[in-house]
């Protein structure tokens, strides 16, 4: 959030598509795999005309097109999550794919904590992009992404658990 603005005053675009809930863990982690990001542009204050409509900020995130020459696999392990990304050609120099998935592993450490200090939280997300090059200047892209946060909250009265499973996602076909 920028300048104290809420989600309705800050816009996040993923390849030109608005993302309405852009983060996990109260927006500490973005809902897209960092290995899949080609570039990101942040606008604060004055925005280009096509991006008007928000008063605090606009962030444009563009995903990579898959590698058009060879198949590539990437595995990333860091503190909050593990991710994998696959990319490569379907038709060399014409049609490529990029698929990335990520899962937090904070919940795996719960068994090390006492019952009252457990996090009881996990996140998942995926990004995929299919790109077809008609010419050097014309490309058709199909994009999908999805994200999920699982919260398991213990109720103190009877020891039961309540699960809150918000789901966010956009599909373009």
Where are these regions (language model features)?
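Transmembrane beta-strands of outer-membrane beta-barrel proteins
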Residues: 42, 60, 74-78, 98-102, ...
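Residue-level signature of outer-membrane beta-barrel architecture
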Residues: 63, 77, 88-90, 132-134
């Amino acid at each position: 959030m920028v300048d104290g603005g809420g989600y309705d005053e800050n816009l996040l675009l993923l390849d030109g598509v608005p993302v309405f809930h852009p983060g996990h863990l109260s927006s500490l982690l973005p809902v897209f795999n960092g290995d899949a990001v080609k570039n990101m542009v942040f606008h604060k204050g004055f925005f280009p005309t096509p991006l008007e409509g928000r008063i605090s900020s606009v962030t444009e995130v563009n995903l990579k097109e898959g590698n058009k020459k060879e198949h590539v696999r990437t595995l990333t392990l860091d503190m909050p999550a593990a991710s994998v990304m696959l990319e490569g050609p379907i038709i060399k120099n014409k049609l490529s794919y990029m698929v990335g998935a990520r899962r937090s592993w904070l919940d795996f450490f719960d068994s090390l904590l006492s019952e009252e200090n457990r996090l009881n939280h996990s996140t998942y997300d995926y990004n995929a992009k299919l790109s077809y090059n008609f010419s050097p200047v014309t490309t058709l892209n199909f994009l999908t992404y999805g994200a999920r946060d699982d919260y398991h909250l213990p109720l103190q009265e009877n020891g039961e658990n309540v699960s809150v499973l918000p789901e966010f996602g956009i599909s373009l076909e």
